Amino acid sequence: MPGIKRILTVTILALCLPSPGNAQAQCTNGFDLDRQSGQCLDIDECRTIPEACRGDMMCVNQNGRYLCIPRTNPVYRGPYSNPYSTPYSGPYPAAAPPLSAPNYPTISRPLICRFGYQMDESNQCVDVDECATDSHQCNPTQICINTEGGYTCSCTDGYWLLEGQCLDIDECRYGYCQQLCANVPGSYSCTCNPGFTLNEDGRSCQDVNECATENPCVQTCVNTYGSFICRCDPGYELEEDGVHCSDMDECSFSEFLCQHECVNQPGTYFCSCPPGYILLDDNRSCQDINECEHRNHTCNLQQTCYNLQGGFKCIDPIRCEEPYLRISDNRCMCPAENPGCRDQPFTILYRDMDVVSGRSVPADIFQMQATTRYPGAYYIFQIKSGNEGREFYMRQTGPISATLVMTRPIKGPREIQLDLEMITVNTVINFRGSSVIRLRIYVSQYPF
C-alpha cells in the first residue's frame, strides 16, 4: 500500500499524542499545539529563533523545520510550499480521544511536496526544471542550471558573480596579453605592437623579420626586436626617411683630407695631384717629380736643368757684364787691376733655390759665410737689391757668417732675385771690399 505509507509519512510530521498521566496532547518537533483549535501548527523558526542562519545564509521556513541556504544562490520554492506564508490551513483531523493504549489514527490529508518539487500524475514528487519552464529569476547575463529541488544562476565565461549580478572580468588587469590588451564585455582580445605578429595562442607576440619578408631598405637591412634599421654602404649616409642612402661628400668634411685636390665619387673619393707631382702610398700626399733626374725636361744642351717643386727651370749660362770676367759656370770676377772695378764688388756668385708657396715665417732660407778670415778684418752682411717688398732681412749669426730670413709668406708662382752683399773691412791695411751672391729664388705654385 504505497499510498498509505506516503500519508503516514506526512502525518507523522504533525502527530498529536496523549501524554501518559497527562490529559494534554503533544506535538512532534517543529509543531506547536494550538489549544483553541486543538491542532498542531508549524513553528516558524525563522521568526522565533534569533539568528537561525548566520553570515550569508538565508533562513527558509518549512513544515516542521527550516533551511539555511546561501543568499547568492537562492533556491526558489515550488507552488506547494511557501515558507513566508502562514502554515497550511486545510482541515486537520480532530484530536484523538484519550485511550488507555496508543492507537494511531489514519489521517487523510493532501500530499505536500517540498519546494522545488511538484506532484506528477502518479502522485510522485518530482523535481521542477525551473530553467526549462522559464520560472527562474536569473538575469540575462546569467546561465540557469537546474538542480534537485531548485536551480542556480551561474555566470558565463568572462563574468564573475557579485551580489547576484554577473560583472565583466577585466582580463587586461591580470596580464593575459603579452603586449596590447583590449577588454570587451565577457572577453578580451590581444594585439601586438608594430613589428610583431600574434602567435597561435592568441596571447604572445613574435617578432616580424621585415628584412626577410619585404626588405624595405635600399642597401642593407638589419632586423631588430620589433623593428628594423637600414644601413648604408661605406661612402653613403642614411637619409631622413631612414630607408634611402645618398652619397657622402667626403671632400666637404675637411680641406685637409687631400694635400692637393679631393675628387668625390659615388660611395668614395680620391685625391689627385697637380702636374709635376705623384700621389704617395697614403693616397693623399703629393711628392714632387724630379724631372731633371728622370730626364723628363725640355732643356737644351747649353742650359742647366734645375728642379723645382712641381716643375723645373732651364737656366741659361751666366753672362758677365763688363768689366766682369766669367771664371766659372756660376762666378764672375772684376779684376783688381781694372780701374772700372774700383767701386764694384770683387766677385758675383750666382745661386739658385726654391721655396714652397705660403711657407710659414719667419724662416731661415739661406746662409752666407766668408771663406777667408784676415787678421784685423771684420765683415758686414746686407741685402743690396731686390728686397723692395721688405720680405727678407739679413741676420748676422757670427763674425764671418749671416743668414737670410724670410719675414713674410710669399704666394707663388714667382721669381725673386736678391743681391746679398758681404763687405770686408780691414782697418790695419785700410782696405774695404765686397763680394755679392746673386740669389735667384723660385716660389712654387703649391704649398708642397
From Swiss-Prot:
Post-translational modification: N-glycosylated.
Protein name stated in the entry: Fibulin-5
Subcellular location: Secreted; Secreted, Extracellular space, Extracellular matrix
Origin superkingdom: Eukaryota
Signal peptide, first to last residue: 1-23
Domain EGF-like: 42-82, 127-167, 168-206, 207-246, 247-287, 288-333
Subunit relationships: Homodimer. Monomer, homodimerizes in presence of Ca(2+). Interacts with ELN. Interacts (via N-terminus) with the integrins ITGAV/ITGB3, ITGAV/ITGB5 and ITGA9/ITGB1. Interacts with FBN1 (via N-terminal domain). Forms a ternary complex with ELN and FBN1. Interacts with EFEMP2 with moderate affinity. Interacts with LOXL1.
UniProt keywords, alphabetically: Calcium, Cell adhesion, Disulfide bond, EGF-like domain, Extracellular matrix, Glycoprotein, Repeat, Secreted, Signal
InterPro entries listed in its UniProt record: cEGF, EGF-like_Ca-bd_dom, EGF-like_dom, EGF-type_Asp/Asn_hydroxyl_site, EGF_Ca-bd_CS, Fibulin_C, Growth_fac_rcpt_cys_sf, Nephronectin_domain
Cellular component GO terms, alphabetical: collagen-containing extracellular matrix; extracellular space
Organism taxonomic ancestry: Eukaryota, Metazoa, Chordata, Craniata, Vertebrata
Function in brief: Essential for elastic fiber formation, is involved in the assembly of continuous elastin (ELN) polymer and promotes the interaction of microfibrils and ELN. Stabilizes and organizes elastic fibers in the skin, lung and vasculature. Promotes adhesion of endothelial cells through interaction of integrins and the RGD motif. Vascular ligand for integrin receptors which may play a role in vascular development and remodeling. May act as an adapter that mediates the interaction between FBN1 and ELN.
Region (Interaction with LOXL1): 245-448
Organism: Pongo abelii (Sumatran orangutan)
GO molecular function, a single term: integrin binding
Entry coiled-coil feature ranges: none
Stated family: Belongs to the fibulin family.
Glycosylation, residue list: N283, N296
Positions of short motif Cell attachment site: 54-56
Record SMART domains: EGF (SM00181), EGF_CA (SM00179)
